[in-house]
Design a protein with these regions (language model features):
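Helix-loop-helix "hairpin" substructures at the membrane interface of multi-pass membrane proteins
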Residues: 6-8, 21, 70-152, 157
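Transmembrane helix-bundle core of multi-pass membrane transporters
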Residues: 36, 40-90, 119-120, 141-145, ...
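Hydrophobic core segments of alpha-helical transmembrane domains in multi-pass membrane transport
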Residues: 48-49, 76-87, 125-133, 156-163, ...
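Transmembrane alpha-helical segments in multi-pass inner-membrane proteins
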Residues: 14, 129, 133, 139-204
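Cytosolic-side transmembrane-helix boundaries in multi-pass membrane proteins
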Residues: 84, 102-109, 113-116, 188-232
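Membrane-embedded helix boundary and interhelical linker motif in transport proteins
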Residues: 1-31, 55-56, 60, 194
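Loop-to-transmembrane alpha-helix initiation sites
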Residues: 37, 66-75, 118, 147-154, ...
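Short, non-helical or kinked segments that cap or interrupt transmembrane helices
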Residues: 1, 7-9, 28-43, 96, ...
Length: 232
């Protein structure tokens, strides 16, 4: 973008770069037999060095450059990703993908190549992550190699919040619930800032929110069981 490349093309290249990172991680895990977490750490560390090489420094401003900075573009990107993922998951390949995520042994018993499914999952997820990072950097007006730190907590919190508030729903509604969960999470962070809390404690607050969200289903089951026993 800073070199005058079309921002749409630059964003698409970022998506492809994320897919490549996911592919390498998947191959290290499935072919190299390196544990998933360790494979992810290895690729993430390598990507950090590659980003420094491409950017030339840790922080790069995008002010004055032609970039994608529009709410409608971000909303359109989210809706496009939702529709594409929903369509994919309803195909035969998508169903095999879901089966692998639910139960690897069962999927293998049906003749599904679970290794390929795992690589595919990493490719798609890392591509979407890179796309999100590209759009956020353009919206904020700068790119930083450390910008992705803590994003895993935000992602988990978004999924858990969506699962808690939207339990037994259809596939598309479940995908949309994750988006609602991410928006709700950002509102919680904004509320903490507005209340005057020290911003240095945001990651601590994020971890607490995630822990509470993870415990809500357990407490909900216990409460429902207690109510049912009292009713009997």
């Amino acid at each position: 973008i800073t070199q005058g490349v079309n921002p749409f093309l630059a964003t698409f290249v970022a998506f492809l770069a994320g897919c490549a990172a996911g592919l390498i991680t998947g191959l290290l895990y499935t072919k190299g037999k390196i544990p998933t977490l360790l494979a992810g750490i290895l690729v993430m560390t390598s990507c950090n060095s590659i980003m420094l090489m491409v950017m030339g420094r840790a922080n790069l401003g995008l002010l004055g450059a032609d970039k994608l900075k529009s709410t409608w573009i971000s909303v359109s990107a989210v809706l496009l990703v939702l529709v594409l993922i929903f369509y994919f998951l309803n195909t035969n390949l998508g169903q095999a993908f879901i089966a692998t995520g639910d139960n690897v042994e069962m999927a293998q018993s049906f003749g599904i190549n679970t290794g390929r499914m795992e690589v595919l999952g990493l490719v798609v997820s890392n591509g979407v992550i890179a796309l999100s990072g590209a759009l956020i950097s353009q919206n904020d007006g700068y790119a930083d190699v450390s910008k992705g730190i803590g994003v895993i907590v935000i992602g988990l919190a978004s999924i858990i919040i969506g699962e808690v508030f939207f339990g037994n729903v259809s596939l598309f509604e479940r995908l949309f619930a994750i988006v609602i969960g991410s928006i709700f999470y950002q509102f919680l962070i904004l509320a903490v800032i507005k209340l005057g809390f020290n911003t240095n404690y945001l990651k601590l607050f994020s971890a607490i929110v995630l822990a509470i969200c993870l415990m809500i289903p357990t407490f909900k089951d216990k409460i429902f069981k207690g109510v049912k026993l009292n009713a009997e």
